[in-house]
């Protein structure tokens, strides 16, 4: 509204529907889009689509995640390596606060929805790097990192399986909303108040866990509204012929726990 521009919104029902997102990109080109704002579902597959769009002199602004090429004009997203490191730091603090001893065996399970999403891969990388340099020697990451394909039910069954197969699990890192919700559902269903959760994003299920004093949880809240808002402003400028030398813009994150929820209105 602020820019007085016509915006046509299209999306896929499941983040694994990569071909569907490619089809939407092709439709946008065919229908004469002046610019495209894209949250890529796959960092590899969408690279070719972005290249085809830019070959037609149509600017592309990415939000939420980047692609594995330079074929875009700007990208507004979380610094996901930094966010992963923050998540690992928070995990260690919460594990200590929950009474876990650094000399006792302990494991942390990890889930993500896609191992071809640059954003999620970077979150895991940041988490593992911080963990390797700061966790006690007896505390380990479960090597079986689960990929749930954006399916909440699979995320829940994967979390349950990890608990069943790894008796020393005392923590979970959910790298995105789907993974976090699946883990939350498992912890509630199995009443695992002894397991710490560090998640991403803030679904109703996650908020319910954070508000329950019997459970130990925190979530990394991305600023999606800023990604979309700043991305649209940038796209409008590019359509008008303005250029920017900077391509990546970190929109930041907020660590949300029960205290933060009480003190702030988080939508």
What kind of feature is each model-predicted range?
Residues 1, 8-10, 35, 40, ...:
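Short beta-strand segments enriched in small/hydrophobic residues
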Residues 1-4, 83-90, 118-138, 154, ...:
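Short, solvent-exposed amphipathic alpha-helices that sit
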Residues 2-14, 107-110, 128, 132-152:
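Short beta-strand elements in bilobed, periplasmic/extracellular small-molecule ligand-binding domains
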Residues 44-82, 86, 98-107, 203-212, ...:
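Flexible loop/hinge segments that line or gate small-molecule binding clefts
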Residues 105-115, 119, 130-131, 202, ...:
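Hinge/cleft segment of the Venus flytrap/periplasmic-binding protein
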């Amino acid at each position: 509204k602020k820019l007085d521009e016509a915006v046509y919104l299209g999306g896929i029902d499941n983040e694994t529907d990569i071909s569907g997102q490619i089809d939407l990109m092709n439709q946008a080109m065919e229908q004469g889009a002046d610019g495209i704002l894209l949250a890529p579902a796959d960092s590899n597959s969408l690279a070719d689509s972005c290249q085809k769009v830019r070959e037609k002199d149509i600017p592309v602004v990415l939000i939420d995640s980047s692609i594995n090429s330079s074929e875009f004009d700007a990208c507004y997203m979380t610094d996901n390596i930094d966010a992963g490191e923050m998540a690992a730091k928070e995990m260690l603090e919460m594990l200590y606060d929950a009474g876990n001893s650094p000399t006792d065996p302990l494991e942390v399970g990890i889930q993500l929805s896609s191992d071809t999403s640059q954003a999620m891969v970077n979150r895991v990388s940041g988490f593992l790097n911080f963990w390797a340099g700061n966790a006690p020697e007896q505390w380990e990451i479960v090597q079986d990192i689960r990929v749930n394909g954006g399916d909440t039910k699979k995320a829940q069954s994967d979390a349950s399986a990890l608990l069943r197969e790894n008796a020393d699990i005392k923590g979970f890192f959910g790298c995105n909303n789907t993974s976090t919700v699946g883990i939350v559902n498992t912890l509630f269903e199995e009443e695992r108040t002894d397991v710490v959760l560090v998640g991403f994003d803030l679904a109703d299920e996650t908020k319910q866990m954070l508000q329950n004093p019997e459970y130990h949880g925190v979530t990394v809240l991305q600023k999606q509204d800023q990604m979309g808002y700043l991305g649209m402003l940038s796209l409008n400028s590019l359509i008008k012929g303005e250029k920017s030398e900077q391509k990546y813009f970190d929109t930041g994150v907020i660590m949300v726990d029960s205290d933060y929820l009480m003190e702030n209105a988080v939508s």
